[in-house]
Design a protein with these regions (language model features):
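N-terminal pro-sequences and low-complexity stem/linker regions of secreted or lumenal proteins
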Residues: 1-111
Length: 111
């Protein structure tokens, strides 16, 4: 179970610098009442829940920044100063062209 995995990760000496993201890549149907932002032909799609577990996460905070599953890649790219992936640039440019903000990189949920 996920809870067992999280408990083991939290017991790790590396946990002080760890970010655990629990999410999934399927929304499960048409339940969401919020219309997805208009981007390119592939998305972003409907909202999906995510939980961030980390000593670096803001405690008791609900982040309303728009994210997609590629936001995890955005975070890794930003954190380690890697070149931006072309697909992320394409998606963000499509969102901006439609008057929407680019997707976030999870940093708003962190201290």
């Amino acid at each position: 179970h996920i809870a067992d995995l999280v408990t083991k990760l939290q017991a790790s000496p590396q946990y002080a610098n760890m970010l655990i993201v629990i999410t999934y890549d399927e929304f499960g149907g048409v339940w969401d009442h919020v219309v997805p932002p208009k981007g390119d032909k592939l998305g972003p799609g409907t909202r999906i829940p995510a939980i961030i577990i980390s000593p670096l996460a803001k405690s008791g905070y609900v982040d309303h920044t728009p994210y997609d599953t590629a936001s995890i890649l955005r975070f890794i790219t930003r954190r380690w100063s890697l070149p931006t992936l072309a697909g992320l640039t394409t998606r963000d440019n499509a969102l901006k062209a439609n008057g929407q903000p680019a997707m976030g990189d999870l940093s708003n949920a962190l201290q």
